[in-house]
Every structure is written in C-alpha cells, then in structure tokens.
Amino acid sequence: MSLDFVLVPGPLVRASSWEPTAQQLRKSGHNVQTPDVLDNQQSPPAWRAWTSHLLQCITPCHEPILVGHSSASPLVADLARRLPCRCIIIVDGEVPPSRGPASPIRPALFDFIRSIAASDGTLPIWSRWFAGDPRRTSLIGLDLLARDPPAFAEFERGLPSLSVDWFDDAIELADWDHVPAGLIQCSPIYDHAALEARRRGWPVVRLEGTHLHPTLEPVETTKALVSMSRDMIG
C-alpha cells in the first residue's frame, strides 16, 4: 500500500535536506511532497505565519502523513488542525506542547544564538552556529556532510539568513494531540524529546545517527518512516 507523505523541513534549512529521503520514499512507491516556503519568498516570513505559507505549498491529497524534522515539529502539529492527516511523525525534534505557544527553538538555544549574533542582530547561517564546537558539529552531522565539499557548498547556499529577533516569536497551537503521533530520534540531542514522547505514550524509534540523518542516511530514515506510519495507521 502506497502512502502519502508531506516532509516538512525546519525554517533553518531548506527542503533539499529532505530530498534524499524523499527520493528513497518515491523509489519505494510512495507519494511525497517536500514543501519549501522559501522557494517563493524573498525573505523568511514570521514564524507565527509559517504554517499558512506551508499550506500554500502543499498540493491537496487525501489525509497525508505529516513529518516534521527538527524545528518543524510545531509546524506539523499546527498543520494537523488545518489539514486532515492520518498521523504525525517528528524526526529528531522537540515534542510540541499539546496546546499553547510553541517557539521555534528552546530557551537555552535562544540564549546561545544571542551570544553569536552580530551587533545588528544578524546571525550566521545555521551550519555555522556551532563552528567552535566539534562535538555539536558531529552530533548534527555537519562534519560528515562537509566531506563532500560541492554538496556542502550547495547545502549552505540555500540556508536563510535570520536575525535573533525572528526567533522571539511563537505559534499558538490549538489542541492537536488527538492525532496519532510518533517520534524518530536520530541523535542524542533529542534524548529529552524521546522521554517526553514515551511519557505521552507515543511510539519511539531510535536510530544511531546524527541530526541530519534524513540527508545522510535516507534508506534507514525511509524504513523507519514507513514502518512507524504503518504501525500507527494499521
């Protein structure tokens, strides 16, 4: 049975980060969309408006599986109340609150980016946030991606330039946790999210990889997505 997937990237990257997994899913006979808000925007829209822009990028289909990577987890939770779906899968991201405000990043990370911003509030592109932290770079998988310089340069060219102020925003989530949801954890960065997902009774799959697993290990990511989807929807 073929499945319909909508793979949503976080605003810090582009849909190209999902493309290796999207291609693998298509090879396996599934239908896939990778909406990219920044394709049609000269500058990134506000976080609180991101879901509305996503909806404009999604071709109508019958109850897709919404998959959010990293900071896209609140986006798929918000999408679920506007777009009938079969289930939600979060890949290496936060577990959004059941309702109420959801910020693009955790408070500790917000404090960190304030420390690396230029005097006008401009931030480096996301791939350079942790340039001085080899361990974090390794957990994310940027060191692996950088082993292919042309591919890494192409990846970086697409990353948006954001300011600190952009992150001082929230999406107001309506009740969404009646929708079946699961978590695929790819890196130790989201150990806390896996604990919260289990507390809520979600299925959790642990892959031994990096944050950029959908980019770097598309075959394993695809298998996990398909298996979890079928387990949840029956």
Tell what function each PLM region has.
Residues 67-76:
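Gly/Ala-rich beta-loop-alpha elbow adjacent to hydrolase catalytic centers
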Residues 8-11, 70, 93, 186:
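Glycine-rich His-Gly loop
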Residues 66-67, 88, 183:
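Conserved alpha/beta-hydrolase fold motif
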Residues 31-65, 103-116:
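Active-site loop/oxyanion-hole signature of alpha/beta-hydrolase fold enzymes
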Residues 125-174:
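Conserved alpha/beta-hydrolase catalytic His-Asp/Glu region
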